[in-house]
Amino acid sequence: MLTVYNTMTRKKEEFHPLRAGEVNIYCCGVTPYNDPHIGNARPFVTWDVIRRYLARKGYAVRYIQNFTDVDDKIINAANREGVTWKEISDRYIAAYFKAMDALNVRRADVFPRVSETMADIQRMIETLIARGYAYVTLSLIHI
């Protein structure tokens, strides 16, 4: 039995997947603008342990982890180095994989990149705003 803390009910509860025998995990990944460090590794090591545990218990686990490969920090690093944001992202994604491989963290099944899903993200934000779950200020969208 796996017990998890439900932040909505503020109670520990027995884990039950939405679909019997299947578990889908989405983990927000790194923003690759610098070399990975222990703080980057912690969530991925944690999810790797959970994923392996669930698989050992017989669940079919699908694990997705994104890369925020376009971001102010990435653009600033690119400007400092005189290269493109994509070169910065690609370099540090490769460094991230190298570090996670050294820690024996299993790779996710899918690694979507923000740069490849921007239209979907914009549509989702518009939907959240239209439904009243987000609002816009002069400089930000608050969700």
Kindly label every feature range from the protein language model:
Residues 1-142:
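NTP-dependent nucleotidyl-transfer catalytic core
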